[in-house]
């Protein structure tokens, strides 16, 4: 009798319920064979529920999507907190952690787990790290544990690259001035982007945006582009890497915000630094200087403003993201793989 039930079973949840009900009725009639049937069906029912639960679709969260929704609101480079409920940078943290762990496992299979302890720990406990961080430092996407934290870094943190940038100050400035002449012909020349600010104007000219080179812009500034290739610690192969010229017009205030990660140092080389301009990181103010690099951790709450007059002209810096000096070479390689553009 129980074999006939299995043959006729429609392999659905409703079929299971009907069979179990029939089996229970048989038990009441003291049918010994039905007891075995009910037991088998209960086991199959448990298996069915487990199987259905495993196959529930999970939202796919690519690493790149973390920084995409911001652009739709007129922002770029993860520069400001996004209020959009659809922005993957601000939601779906569980799906993100699963994706990051999958990327780490794939990297370890290809190469090695050696030196991956801190990254593994960071991914495994990402939610706790981000929620427990003090409000003065709160990276929005990825926090690597056990890195020394400070709002500003000394020039010696990445001495080679700082000195190389400062030696090439005049070359970068010259290429910027050529670019900036185009502003007299139209409101926004090709290659420039406008960033959202509560007051004033903030423009950027990207060479590398979220780990992706912008060829058209690089061709307009060949010496600056070659210089980027000479930097030893430039982040160029993952979504946390950016390089651009950043221009603040007089009267501009950038809203306080956090960067996406603590694995990088943001470097500003001053090109034009009139009076009344200031950078505030973690509550500590600093001023730019022409021809000098200013290094800071943008995972700290930070802002910038230009309180000068129109006669002072814009504040201009060359911005590039460098590796945090305490991220080991093996970790850099793995993070480039995990956070590769398009992954």
Curated annotation (Swiss-Prot):
Topological domains, Lumenal: 53-343
Cofactor(s) needed for function: Fe cation
Membrane-spanning intervals of the chain: 32-52
Keywords linked to the UniProt accession: Dioxygenase, Glycoprotein, Iron, Membrane, Metal-binding, Oxidoreductase, Signal-anchor, Transmembrane, Transmembrane helix
Cytoplasmic-facing ranges: 1-31
Protein name: Aspartate beta-hydroxylase domain-containing protein 2
Glycoprotein is among the record's keywords: yes
GO MF entries: dioxygenase activity; metal ion binding
Location relative to the cell: Membrane
Entry EC no(s): 1.14.11.-
Residues reported to bind Fe cation: 257, 302
GO CC term, one of those recorded: membrane
Protein's gene: Asphd2
Organism listed in the record: Mus musculus
Annotated membrane topology: Single-pass type II membrane protein
Residues with attached carbohydrate: 77, 185
Family membership: Belongs to the aspartyl/asparaginyl beta-hydroxylase family.
Binding annotation for 2-oxoglutarate: 202, 246, 266-268, 315
Species classification: Eukaryota, Metazoa, Chordata, Craniata, Vertebrata
Tagged with keyword RNA-binding: no
Name of one Pfam family that matches: Asp_Arg_Hydrox
Function description: May function as 2-oxoglutarate-dependent dioxygenase.
Origin: domain of life: Eukaryota
Listed Gene3D superfamilies: B-lactam Antibiotic, Isopenicillin N Synthase, Chain (2.60.120.330)
